[in-house]
Amino acid sequence: MSMSYRALKFRRHAPTSTQHHPKEDMNFHQQPPGLPGPALGQTMSPPPWQMGESNPDFLPNNFNQLNLDPQQPEADGGQQRSKGSENNLYRKYEEKVRPCIDLIDSLRALGVEQDLALPAIAVIGDQSSGKSSVLEALSGVALPRGSGIITRCPLVLKLTKRECEWTGKITYRNVTQQLHNPSEVEREIRRAQNIIAGNGVGISHELINLEVTSPEVPDLTLIDLPGITRVAVENQPQDIGLQIKALIKTYIQRQETINLVVVPCNVDIATTEALSMAQEVDPDGDRTIGILTKPDLVDKGTEKGVLKVMQNLTYHLKKGYMIVKCRGQQDITNKLSLAEATRKEVMFFQTHPYFRVLLDEGKATVPLLAERLTTELIWHINKSLPLLENQIKEKHQRATEELQQYGDDIPSNEGDKMFFLIEKIKLFNEDIEKLIEGEEIVIETESRLCNRIREEFTRWVLILTTNIEKVKSILNEEVSKYETKYRGKELLGFVNYKTFETVVKHYLGQLIDPALKMLQKAMEIIWQTFKDTAKKHFAEFCNLHQTVQNKIEDIKTKQMAEAANLIQLQFRMEKLVFCQDQIYGVVLNKVREEIFNSVGKASENPQSKHPFLNNQSSVSSIVEIGVHLNAYFTETSKRLANQIPFIIQYFMLQENGDKVQKAMMQLLQETQHYSWLLQEQSDTATKRKFLKEKIFRLTQAQQALYEFPHFKSI
């Protein structure tokens, strides 16, 4: 028989007040358990089935965790039927409710909470709010008490209702301690906090897990957080208040968390820090439940103020409030048992002239609080499962992709290291080869290496075209200057070959710098791409990565010098002014036809400013030399438009890539350096281990969700 069952069964035999209350006995079959109807003026936000909807799939229609009927059976047969009904409901409860809580507890045990938020109930309160007393009443075990900060680490309190002997287990870091008696709990929690947070008054974000299995506890999992303090005392850090608030906020700000805010009845609720923090992260109170404690300490005449709070008229929370009376310090001194304290609690509310109505409404006593919290948690879990599945799937995929970037673990055997290095170099060389052939895979916003180089070659063609147009635009001036300087005994109108040759050499010489700049630009593009490829494959191996970068740099420098020399050689050869007769003749005739047609039309127009007509005395000479210059530059530009890119592609891409691949293969001959080359960065192995552990627990979580019997029906 559960503690809550015995407590409320006791109520049926407790003495009643002399005042008349016709509906003092409760019939819990009138509505689902722990889901009290709102008092006058109170608006609550219970799970959906409380608002006129049918019970959810995970609760039977006649389900009641406490299963209380105020009418006593009149005969043994009635008792047997009642007991059979109770066992049947309990079996349905075990089938429908327990798996939900076990699922989330198993995910939490796997460490999934490191990766995403799980549905939970977080308990917060100011110091001396009665938070520990509430948790003690729910769990049936004594928790650390005293002045100052008592809860110094988040405590996950997992309560499991089972018909067996009391058992407990505390887990933290690599420690798992079995507990055989409730009296051991307080001592072991203090020991765990000292190990984690140190002896003293410091706090830690590290979790302590306490599991309690007993027939006297509800099925519930809570997270107890440190009490909120405003002023540092004794040896506490001056910012201890900020530290505690930051810790609490990490839990209560999660949308998956139900915030259980514990507030004493004998304080102004508007001044409580805990409720203020809850409102900050949950302004509408959608996931906040208020718990009022210490109703026996309320000053006479202020009871109505407490009732207004309970009726949601003072500080509105959609989920409303519950009120409990737990053991006080005198009760603890007198060693009052928790079971007896529960009976006294029921008696207190039954006989209280103001608060008895709260008992009638199902908003008072620890057993009803336990029932309410269990129902809220189950509903919250079922609501969160589809989103939880998607989050686990997404994080598993991202972790898997990230792990691929770190590669496999480094083998310890020297022979295995060679094969490991061979595989690494093979993959790198394959990517270099794809770059050379223009077959690498790129994302939509990027462009292949060959295409980026081709863009530079396109600019080179524009430079050559601009050079031809420049020659045309200043032809009259240039030819006149060279005619004056180099003309010999030939008559007016005869072409001076020296003039033609000088103009050609001068303007071809102006193309050397643009060609070398194009080489430099193409080299930078190729060099950066090779470096990025090396980083992709070897970034986690600091020595190997640096070695490869050095080889890429050395080879690039040599190839750059060879390509530059060949480009300069090309322009030195261009000074020979040569073109095959059959090729030049065709181009010359075509250009002559175009130019003379243009000049003929211009001569018919007296106002024409054609450059060839500005000096009539030398028109024939200028026109003729212009024809030859135009023809020669047209053909030379075609030659240079291809030849310079050929040189760059061969030396800086093809041969450069081949030499890099060969240099990588030569690394395999340095067997004595394998260990040095494969030395990872300090945090790489740690990251790989972390990601593997993350993937493992997320895989386990996916499996747990898949095996959850109710998941497909949610």
UniProtKB/Swiss-Prot annotation:
It comes from the Eukaryota. One of its GO terms (cellular component) is cytoplasm. The keyword GTP-binding applies. One of its GO terms (biological process) is defense response to virus. Residues 1-89 are annotated as: Disordered. Residues 115-386 form the Dynamin-type G domain. Residues 224-227 are annotated as: G3 motif. Signal peptide: none annotated. It is found in: Cytoplasm; Nucleus. This is Interferon-induced GTP-binding protein Mx2. It comes from Ovis aries (Sheep).
